[in-house]
């Protein structure tokens, strides 16, 4: 069952990693965060979507966002390299998380079969605004390559 507005965000599994194997991700229990699901690191649409979130991070922070978490169904080494490529070698306040088996994305109910192009199940492209552990807004693209309702500008406008 997919998460929905008003539902509690499930805790991430220990296998959701950031920067290194075994470096498990936890989300703050209080405050406002944004989760971004993307089909794949280094894919052209995903690589064009995320830089806007990096560039506009301070605008999100000014609206009370304590963290932005990008989740891709890729291995940790791929996701870390993607972060470094998109952030231009600079430290980014946007978190890049690897859900290598897709376990968390499946728990959220936001996976789809991308085996024809990307080899396995992947994350739908989505943006979720979560406050104090509750989903306040959820934007899901109808087609994976589209970037309309999940654009940084659109999500900022809804905060």
What feature does the model see in each segment?
Residues 1-159:
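Chalcogenol-based redox active-site neighborhoods
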């Amino acid at each position: 069952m997919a998460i929905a507005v008003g539902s509690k965000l499930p805790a991430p599994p220990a296998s959701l990693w950031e920067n290194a194997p075994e470096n498990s991700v936890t989300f703050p229990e209080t405050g406002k965060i944004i989760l971004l699901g993307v089909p794949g690191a280094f894919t052209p649409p995903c690589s064009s979507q995320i830089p806007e979130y990096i560039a506009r991070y301070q605008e999100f922070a000014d609206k009370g966002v304590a963290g932005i978490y990008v989740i891709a169904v890729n291995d940790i080494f791929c996701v870390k390299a993607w972060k470094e490529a998109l952030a231009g070698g600079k430290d980014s306040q946007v978190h890049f998380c690897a859900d290598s088996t897709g376990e968390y994305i499946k728990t959220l109910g936001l996976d789809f079969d991308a085996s024809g192009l990307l080899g396995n199940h992947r994350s739908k492209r989505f943006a979720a605004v979560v406050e104090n552990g509750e989903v306040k807004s959820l934007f899901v693209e109808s087609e994976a390559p589209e970037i309309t309702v999940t654009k940084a500008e659109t999500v900022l406008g809804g905060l």
